[in-house]
Amino acid sequence: MGTTTWIVILLLAILIAFIVGYFLRKSIAEAKIQGAETEATKIVERAQVSAEATKKEALLEAKDEAFKLRNEVEKELRERRQELTKQEGRLLQKEETLDRRVDSIDRKEEQINTRDAEIAKRKHQAEELERKVEDLYEQGRQELVRVANLSQDEARAIIMDETKQAAMHDAAILQKEIEQKAKEEADKKARNILSLAIQRFAAEHIAETTVSVVNLPNDEMKGRIIGREGRNIRTLETLTGIDLIIDDTPEAVILSGFDPIRREVAKMALEKLVQDGRIHPARIEEMVDKSRREVDERIREIGEEATYDVGIHGIHPDLVKILGRLKYRTSYGQNVLFHSLEVAHLAGMMAAELGEDVTLAKRAGLLHDIGKAIDHEVEGSHVEIGVELGTKYKEHPTVINAIASHHGDTEATSVISVLVAAADALSAARPGARQETLESYIRRLERLEEISESFDGVEKSFAIQAGREVRIIVRPDVVDDVLAHKMASDIRKKIEEELDYPGHIKVTVIRETRAVEYAK
């Protein structure tokens, strides 16, 4: 074959390759276009699914947000309803209080109107009496002039003297009636005020003892507390002034002493020593000093709590600390601080009923026994010491007078002083408030019967009602009815002179005469 033939074949091959490449490229492009269209369709479908999911998620979030918002709104509405309910309750309570006050004012107004009517009636009676006196005076004057031929001046003098005596007699009777009625009304009002104050206030009281108990982890600790040859227990007793009683009581040590502050210091120190485990004289001295400082701080806090409880302020810090010491002071088993708080509240309630200064009454009631906090350290009665403290720390004159007069040592110069004395008597005389040792109680009853039986004609005497009444049986052949009254008065006077007792004692003399005959 020639060259031309190869050239033709080569050209044909190139042409065929071009044609095949063209169609192959076209088919590949179509395949890519179809794949792109398929992918685009898938993307659109995925976008639609994603959009639908996003739409649902947004819808759920919107519903959740709406639900939360509705819950918050409902919660706020409930809170507002509760607040409105509380406000409505407070308004109803205030309305009831106002109604009670209105009723009280109405009753007082009725009493005033009744009293005014009574006064007007008595005034009218007095005017009538005055007219009658004038008529009688004129008649008497004319009669005297006619009968005795007296001058007008002499007749006037005689009639004026008689009229004066008659008027004074009538005025005395009227004055006695008015005083009696006023006394009855005052007694009734006082009983109402006292009963109202008592029923409005209820205080908690605890029985005070002279011992404290410290619990131990085991009985081996007792030996460590005693120490070698008893040096530890001697050191603790010397530093605190408290007796330690270590007996067969399991896992316990008893602290005995009549000073509650020292006993509290000893208790705290011993508890710290037991907890620390190191018990020797130097450590004991360190713990006692630390406990004494803690007790002093606790006393100050107790005083501040007492003033806060009563609602008064402005008391000198040193006086507040002295007030806190009353927590560790008792009188006939009654805690003096609790007693002072009770007196303060009672005095404040009674002052409110009488329209007096409630805050000043509470202040006077809280401080009325302040002298008992240091009466074992300073010479003088607790009243004298209290007056000195009130004067030293510049208390109100009414408070000082209430301190001085609450036992009748000084005359009360204000209504608040009288209220404090009444509140003090209420708190002390309330059943269960104060205790009395069995020995002194029995001795007082025996002495009461001895005084009663020291009079002639007494057959037997009996002290009853816990010593608040004594009944004396007398011999009827020795003591008659007249002498029985005199004997009751004499026994009463002798009891007042020779016996110390709380409250009052009723003396009853019983004389019985029996006539017995037997029918046969």
From Swiss-Prot:
E.C. number(s) listed in UniProt: 3.1.-.-
TM ranges: 4-24
Entry-linked CDD domains: HDc (cd00077), KH-I_RNaseY (cd22431)
Localization per Swiss-Prot or TrEMBL: Cell membrane
A GO MF label: RNA binding
This protein's GO CC annotations: plasma membrane
InterPro entries recorded: HD/PDEase_dom, HD_domain, HDIG_dom, KH_dom, KH_dom_type_1, KH_dom_type_1_sf, Ribonuclease_Y, RNase_Y_N
Domain of life: Bacteria
Pfam families tied to this protein: HD, KH_1, RNase_Y_N
Location of the KH domain: 210-273
Keyword Ribonucleoprotein: no
PANTHER family on file: RIBONUCLEASE Y (PTHR12826:SF15)
Chain's role: Endoribonuclease that initiates mRNA decay.
Recorded family membership: Belongs to the RNase Y family.
Protein name: Ribonuclease Y
